[in-house]
Each structure stands twice: as structure tokens, then as C-alpha cells.
């Protein structure tokens, strides 16, 4: 099978179900942003491979898989309903449990953190901000077509996960968090 089809050469693409839409369609923007997030999540997992972060790497690999499902759900067009499994409640519950565990182990802060101090911390914040952009794109898509609510919930939780993972990396590497002091 060839990687190119020439079907998109005139600025249109097919959604799951066969519907043809412009490549600037809000659904294409949403699933494209999730695809970008998946790539950054993989990079973050690769950067965390080692003896200090085995659980986090495992979590990130599971998140990558869920993000593929999220992207597929955002790519469903006319005739594609029911062709993609949904994001499970368990996936969101897992995120919430991971968030709670990280938060319990971290010192409380009352100021915003500024990304930096370590490449892995910065990459956590890149993932967080791309996730927020993906969530906004999914919300725009939801205004025009059907987007499963679990997609929106998952993306919302996921950005919190990346924030706390950044703080966790700082804590475990003894990197001082950079706090914003206006």
C-alpha cells in the first residue's frame, strides 16, 4: 500500500465514514492537534526512560494509545458513527488517580510555575500547552458537529496530568521549580 493517495492534493481529506472536508475543517484541526500532542507525548516518554520514571513512562505510553482513540473520534464524519471505540471511563479515572497520587507527594504552592529548569520539565509543559490547544480545537469542533463528551473530559484532565508531571520531574530530579512572582 502506498503512503500517498493523491486524494488530498486539492486541499480536501476524508473523515472516517468517507465524508470529504477541507483540510482546514475544525475536525481536521482538532485531530491534527491531538496527533501533534501524541508525538510530543512520545518524545516526553523517551526523555523519561530510565530508572527514576518507569511508572510515568508506562502511563505516557497508555496516554499515547488513548490519544490515538481521541484523534480517531474527532475524525468521525457522516457514516462513521460507531466505527471507533470510545474513550473509556477507566482511562479518565486512571488519569485522575495518577494526578491525585502526584499531587499528594508534592509540596503545595501558591504561585504559578514557569516552565524550565530541566529539558524534561519544559517538555511536560509543551505537552500541557499543546493539550490545552487540542482541547480548544475539540471544543470548536463540538460547536459544529458531534464530539463525544468523554473526549473533552479526557483532554481537560490530561493537561492537568502534564502540569503535575512537570512538577513531579522537578521534585524527583531536585530541580528547583521556577515560580512566577509578578
What positions do the PLM features span?
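Phosphate/pyrophosphate-binding loop motifs in nucleotide- or prenyl diphosphate-using proteins
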Residues: 1-182
Amino acid at each position: 500500500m502506498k503512503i500517498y493517495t493523491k486524494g488530498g492534493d486539492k486541499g480536501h481529506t476524508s473523515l472516517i465514514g468517507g465524508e470529504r472536508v477541507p483540510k482546514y475543517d475544525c475536525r481536521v484541526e482538532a485531530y491534527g492537534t491531538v496527533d501533534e500532542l501524541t508525538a510530543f507525548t512520545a518524545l516526553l516518554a523517551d526523555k523519561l526512560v530510565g530508572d527514576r520514571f518507569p511508572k510515568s513512562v508506562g502511563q505516557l505510553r497508555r496516554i499515547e494509545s488513548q490519544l490515538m482513540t481521541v484523534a480517531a473520534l474527532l475524525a468521525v464524519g457522516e457514516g462513521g458513527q460507531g466505527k471507533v471505540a470510545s474513550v473509556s471511563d477507566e482511562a479518565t479515572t486512571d488519569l485522575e488517580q495518577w494526578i491525585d497520587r502526584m499531587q499528594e507527594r508534592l509540596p503545595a504552592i501558591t504561585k504559578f510555575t514557569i516552565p524550565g529548569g530541566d529539558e524534561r520539565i519544559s517538555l511536560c509543559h509543551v505537552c500541557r500547552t499543546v493539550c490545552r490547544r487540542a482541547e480548544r480545537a475539540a471544543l470548536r469542533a463540538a460547536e459544529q458537529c458531534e464530539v463525544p463528551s468523554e473526549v473533552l473530559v479526557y483532554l481537560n484532565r490530561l493537561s492537568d496530568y502534564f502540569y503535575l508531571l512537570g512538577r513531579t520531574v522537578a521534585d524527583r530530579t531536585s530541580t528547583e521549580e521556577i515560580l512566577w512572582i509578578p
